[in-house]
Amino acid sequence: YVLGLVGAGVALAPLGFRPLGYGLFLLYLSALLASYLAFGDRAASERLLHPFHSPVGLGFMGTLGILLVLHLRYPWPFRVLLGLLGGAVLLLSASRGGLLALALGGAGSVLFQRRGWLALGAVGAVLLLAGTLEVPIAERFFQTHLSGREGLWLAAYEVFQAHPLTGVGPYLLGDGLKGVLFGECFLFPFLEMRGVACPEALKPFGGLWVFAHNHLLQALGESGLLGALGLLLLVGGFLAGAWGDGLLFSLLLAFLAMGMVDNPFSVPSPFRGEVFFLAGGMALARGFQPPLALGLAGASALLLSLPFLYLATRPAPPPPSLLYAAIPPGEGVGVVRLSGQGYRAQVWLCQRGCRRLGWEWDGEKPIVFAFPKDLPPGRYELRLVLFSQHRLAKKPRYVLPFEVKP
């Protein structure tokens, strides 16, 4: 599949990426429509949703649209509209990874074209708008937590430690990551919000779409050292082929930047990862420079490792303490308050198995959660799981159990 995409990219090199802009335009409109159908008048205060894209992925697709607009000569009305919609999607998705991709892609484009400065200006414009908008989602652009990715990174690294040479095989890493951020099987946020849970028949396969949220760790877990080396050489070859082309280089660099905190070029996908390999094929059609490819492969390895260097230098937070826990029987809701800074909290409800309640909370603020309405009566164990944001949060730092009767 990957080789076919690269070959298609070589064949489509004369055509370029102009058709992608029209597809992104339709994607943006469908995302705005889906969010309005899901949230109604609250759509502007909630993260953008799509039936088969996560908010993080939507933000990255917004970045791709902005980069296309800055480098390709679409008709002016469409060019302006696509750029505005791409910026709106990036802003409303509150995707810090998408913003990082735009910043790094723009910086890479500056090496060859002055238009790269416009991409960096777009980053500043998004941050300026986020700072002036009085909506909760805009605050995400100024937060430094990793939304629980630390736990996924650790789990993927532990799989790599157990299988350092060969990994566990393609699409099998997710079995070791299930339950870290979501349950055993999780569909797209839009579907889950609409009450479409993962069918029982799909639950054994839930690991197929659970990823490490870092491409280097994904490769190490799936394919071991040899596979990770192959991925880095492939990326280095793509970047070397794109050297000198502002659009191709910025697109590939944006994918690589996003690869620090997500898996944007995993395939098959809803035509996101496919764009990366098509771009790689177009880059290889321009030629191949082995020395430059090796150097850029090493730079890619360093870039994908930056999150771990960042975490390793963060100081340990002070131990937390429980201020109060109010979980009245039969009310269907609970509130827990902690003291202590630097923690992210997750709430899990366990009986025979465990299910996650809500998403994730800032440990410094009241943790308000609701119990599922279809919960069978009985006694349960409620687990408040606290992750720190330093040294990869190797395991949950603290687990506070409560016996509850929802």
Model-identified regions with their sequence ranges:
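Alpha-helical transmembrane segments of multi-pass inner-membrane proteins
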Residues: L3-A44, H50-F112, G237, G241-W243, ...
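A membrane-periplasm/extracellular boundary helix in multi-pass inner-membrane enzymes
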Residues: Y36-F39, L92-S93, V110-L146, L154-A162, ...
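Cytosolic-side transmembrane helix boundary signature
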Residues: A94-R115, A279-G298
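Interfacial juxtamembrane loops and adjacent helix segments
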Residues: L172-G221
